[in-house]
Curated annotation (Swiss-Prot):
It comes from Saccharomyces cerevisiae (strain ATCC 204508 / S288c) (Baker's yeast). Homohexamer, forming a ring with a central pore. The hexamer is stabilized by high protein concentrations and by ADP or ATP. Oligomerization influences ATP hydrolysis activity at NBD2. Interacts with YDJ1. Interacts (via C-terminal DDLD tetrapeptide) with CNS1, CPR7 and STI1 (via TPR repeats); under respiratory growth conditions. It is found in: Cytoplasm; Nucleus. Inhibited by micromolar concentrations of guanidinium chloride. Inhibits the ATPase activity, but does not dissociate the hexameric protein. The lineage of its organism: Eukaryota, Fungi, Dikarya, Ascomycota, Saccharomycotina. Changing residue 509 to D: Reduces thermotolerance. Present with 32800 molecules/cell in log phase SD medium. This is Heat shock protein 104. Changing residue 444 to M: Reduces ATPase activity by 80%. Residues 412-536 form a coiled coil.
């Protein structure tokens, strides 16, 4: 064999591997086929074999070629025992001589792997193998010449398996992915794609930079550019170009020594500059290149950008561009900004429709068009902190995944019976092992076998039905995948002007598979129609599925809102008045505002806002809670701000977050953080008159435009809130009037007090100012019933099952002493606790009342312990025992305490 120093490292590796193959197969001589077999072995670094790269570039079947080579390799006679030394054959010597001649002709310093390959092509046995594998040698030669380009082999390490070694490692060829149909179709965004292409066609500074919020589709625009390049729908300067996406993670990974990262990056740039084909480099998150001083990759990029030797597309968000890229003026001016806006709901629906087949094929489900419309609408309404179309795509993807997982899992009916059968079979095995069994065991075994046979009989039709339904869906999915592959092949053939292949696919293969899909769809539809509600497999994603997904992600019962919202809103007053008693004017005002908003007649940018005025304990805060519970089925969907905590000037920062430079800047404010993730909420400002005037100033833009700006500069949308403010201003005028209904004169006095305290611009922005009535005796009786019902519900939540039964006299007692002019109905809760719950606790501990029993409460003569019951009343409530006490109680009473105190005084 020739001197080893004449070969490059890769060529020498191939020769060494060929010797090993000959030794492993016990062949006496090293022949050209061993060299060819070494070419198809995967290198130690895991890269694609050189010959595989050439064959696949020529669009030949590499797997078939590999089989032909291995088949010819095993046909060579073996020598037993294996030879001690393997000698090269005459044919191999001729190959190496030809390789040396080719090296000299190309004026290279070393024999490279392509020299050896070209020499192999001259061997008749190798030519026969290529012919058998249906691979054209001339086409492979042409691919090898394109791969080499103008590169000279002037060092032993200059050989490469790929034309663009650095780019193949640290970048992704997006044009190749588009050619193979691996990219999703880009719907819309024509203007942004055209703008990007216009900038790329410039003579200098041909570097667009896409700027927009995360999730609006910046990368999709680049995919659209790649698609247009392979379709030749670009200016002449870009025709035949390649678009690579730089993988910054791969570029950085493993660069442990100083200079490794820079060397890799410069290698990428050098390959782009030296390439005969125009290469456009896309750098996502381009602000990541900006670093510190000499280690900054942006500084390596600047010279190439300034000389116009490089076309780069950047993408970043508004915040990163402003805070990082703009600070380096020299880097920024080399790029032309292209603003990318968030698509509208209508545009998002169009995007979803374009991607619908991809998601149907991936998940094997059927997506209804109504599901796509619902996804776009719900994503816009309930996920405002995310951006379209990303949020809508997530809703569709999660819903499809949920349906696919449920489909691939066994139905509950089938799974339950199979588990029963498994348990019976285990029991049978255990009974069969008992050889000396008595008659009882034998009877049990007989019964178990009968039950097993019965379950098998029940399971057989269930399994058959399940397998038939599942097979139909799987077959349909496979047919759709096949259609997608054929469409991509047809497009590729049309691009290569391979009219024969394109015609065969367009007029024969594709119509056939479409007919098959139609037939399968009819079969599946017929099976679903026949099964009806008893279908074992659910394979459809509809609007309800999307609503359930949105409800899980947001915590808002979206499904219920969308189904029965109209009926709920019509009867809103009836439902709220059963919870909040005696305040019909306030309930009507809130109900009208909610109906106006939901029907789309209200100002979409202005939230419904209310100022509730009235006595303490009249139900202002309670109404806010019930509105949240009514709209969202959860009273926790209310954001409560106690304005008594906001009486200082600096309290504004509690709501909005501190400004830059202050401690806690990154944490944000209480109000802005809550509204960002709960945009559909009831926002309660309790006791708003106690807030500092600057807090009210901040609320002006929220009440007028439905937005507030956080300390970090983010605009928070408040347009979907219901803003409720409560105040006790003018309470003395309400308290002094006769009767429960607010009189016109009292209303004027209260409004006068309100105007004295709040500025006109604040009051003018409020949708409705409502004055709450004084609670009448009739209203107090209703409140008593509501509170007792709430206590029973609280028992259930604590896993206690007591039923309260109060006599009418006992309820009258609670209504009489549970209300005061100063505190409204607030004393009622304390009265119930002192007169009923405390006494009930003692009865329970003494086992006089047990779980799931009725608690009887009566009025009796005696002294009450509640401060709201005057001493001269001489009446209180008594909880009657249902059983005799099993635990003795302390007999020392209140009277005994007082007597003992008097004795102590006498002794003193």
């Amino acid at each position: 064999m020739n001197d080893q120093t004449q070969f490059t490292e890769r060529a020498l590796t191939i020769l060494t591997l060929a010797q090993k193959l000959a030794s492993d197969h016990q062949h006496p001589q090293l022949q050209p086929i061993h060299i060819l077999a070494a070419f198809i072995e995967t290198p130690e670094d895991g890269s694609v074999p050189y010959l595989q790269n050439l064959i696949e570039k020529g669009r030949y079947d590499y797997d078939l070629f590999k089989k032909v080579v291995n088949r010819n390799l095993v046909r060579i006679p073996q020598q037993q025992p294996a030879p001690a030394e393997i000698t090269p054959s005459y044919a191999l010597g001729k190959v190496l001589q030809d390789a040396a001649k080719i090296q000299k002709q190309q004026k290279d310093s070393f024999i490279a792997q392509d020299h050896i390959l070209f020499a192999l092509f001259n061997d008749s046995s190798i030519q026969q193998i290529f012919k058998e594998a249906q691979v054209d040698i001339e086409a492979i030669k042409q691919q090898a010449l394109e791969l080499r380009g103008n590169t000279r082999i002037d060092s032993r390490g200059a050989d490469t398996n790929t034309p663009l070694e650095y780019l193949s490692k640290y970048a992704i060829d997006m044009t190749e992915q588009a050619r193979q149909g691996k990219l999703d179709p880009v719907i819309g965004r024509e203007e942004e794609i055209r703008s990007t292409i216009r900038v790329l066609a410039r003579r200098i500074k041909s570097n667009p930079c896409l700027i927009g919020e995360p999730g609006i589709g910046k990368t999709a625009i680049i995919e659209g550019v790649a698609q247009r390049i392979i379709d030749d729908d670009v200016p002449t300067i870009l025709q035949g170009a390649k678009l690579f996406s730089l993988d910054l993670a791969a570029l950085t990974a493993g660069a442990k020594y100083k200079g490794d990262f820079e060397e890799r990056f410069k290698g990428v740039l050098k390959e782009i500059e030296e390439s005969k084909t125009l290469i456009v480099l896309f750098i996502d998150e381009i602000h990541m290149l900006m670093g510190n001083g000499k280690d900054d990759a942006a500084n390596i990029l600047k010279p190439a950008l300034s000389r116009g030797q490089l076309k780069v597309i950047g993408a970043t968000t508004n915040n990163e561009y402003r805070s990082i890229v703009e600070k380096d003026g020299a880097f920024e001016r080399r790029f032309q900004k292209i603003e990318v806006a968030e698509p509208s709901v209508r545009q998002t629906v169009a995007i979803l429709r374009g991607l619908q087949p991809k998601y149907e094929i991936h998940h094997g489900v059927r997506i209804l068009d109504s599901a796509l419309v619902t996804a776009a609408q719900l994503a816009k309404r309930y996920l405002p902190y995310r951006r379209l179309p990303d949020s809508a795509l997530d809703l569709v993807d999660i819903s499809c995944a949920g349906v696919a997982v449920a489909r691939d899992s066994k139905p509950e009916e089938l799974d339950s019976k199979e588990r029963q059968l498994q348990l019976i079979q285990v029991e049978i095995k255990a009974l069969e092992r008992d050889e000396d069994a008595d008659s009882t065991t034998k009877d049990r075994l007989k019964l178990a076998r009968q039950k097993e046979a019965s379950l098998q009989e029940e399971l057989e039709p269930l399994r058959q039905r399940y397998n038939e339904e599942k097979h139909g869906h799987e077959e349909l999915t496979q047919a759709k995948k096949k259609l997608d592959e054929l469409e991509n092949k047809a497009l590729d053939a049309e691009r290569r002007y391979d009219t024969a292949t394109a015609a065969d696919l367009r007029y024969f293969a594709i119509p056939d598979i479409k007919k098959q899909i139609e037939k399968l769809e009819d079969q599946v539809a017929e099976e679903e129609r026949r099964a009806g509600a008893n279908s074992m497999i659910q394979n459809v994603v509809d609007s309800d599925t999307i609503s359930e997904t949105a409800a899980r992600l947001t915590g808002i019962p979206v499904k219920k809102l969308s189904e029965s919202e109209n009926e709920k809103l019509i009867h809103m007053e009836r439902d709220l008045s059963s919870e909040v008693v005696g305040q019909m004017d306030a309930i009507k005002a809130v109900s009208n505002a909610v109906r106006l908003s939901r029907s789309g007649l209200a100002n979409p940018r202005q939230p419904a806002s209310f100022l509730f005025l009235g006595l303490s304990g009249s139900g202002k805060t309670e109404l806010a809670k019930k509105v949240a519970g009514f709209l969202f089925n959860d009273e926790d969907m209310m954001i409560r701000v106690d304005c008594s905590e906001l009486s200082e000037k600096y309290a504004v920062s509690k709501l909005l977050g501190t400004t830059a430079g202050y401690v806690g800047y990154d944490e944000g404010g209480f109000l802005t953080n809550q509204l960002q993730y709960k945009p559909y909420s009831v926002l309660l400002f309790d006791e708003v008159e106690k807030a500092h005037p600057d807090v009210l100033t901040v609320m002006l833009q929220m009440l007028d435009d439905g937005r507030i700006t956080s300390g970090q500069g983010k605009t928070i949308d408040c347009s979907n809130c219901i803003v409720i403010m409560t105040s006790n201003l003018g309470a003395e005028f309400i308290n002094s009037q006769q009767g429960s209904k607010i009189q016109e004169s009292t209303k004027n006095l209260v409004m006068g007090a309100v105007r004295q305290h709040f500025r006109p611009e604040f009051l003018n922005r409020i949708s409705s100012i409502v004055i709450f009535n004084k609670l009448s005796r009739k209203a107090i009786h209703k409140i008593v019933d509501i509170r007792l019902k709430e206590i029973e519900e609280r028992f259930e939540q604590n896993d206690k099952h007591y039923k309260l039964n109060l006599t009418q006299e006992a309820k009258d007692f609670l209504a009489k002493y549970g209300y005061s002019d100063d505190m409204g109905a607030r004393p009622l809760n304390r009265l119930i606790q002192n007169e009923i719950l405390n006494k009930l606790a003692l009865r329970i501990l003494k086992n006089e009342i047990k779980d799931k029993e009725t608690v009887n409460v009566v009025l009796k003569k005696g002294k009450s312990r509640d401060e709201n019951v005057p001493e001269e009343a001489e009446e209180c409530l008594e909880v009657l025992p249902n059983h005799e006490a099993t635990i003795g109680a302390d007999t020392l009473g209140d009277d005994d305490n007082e007597d003992s105190m008097e004795i102590d005084d006498d002794l003193d």
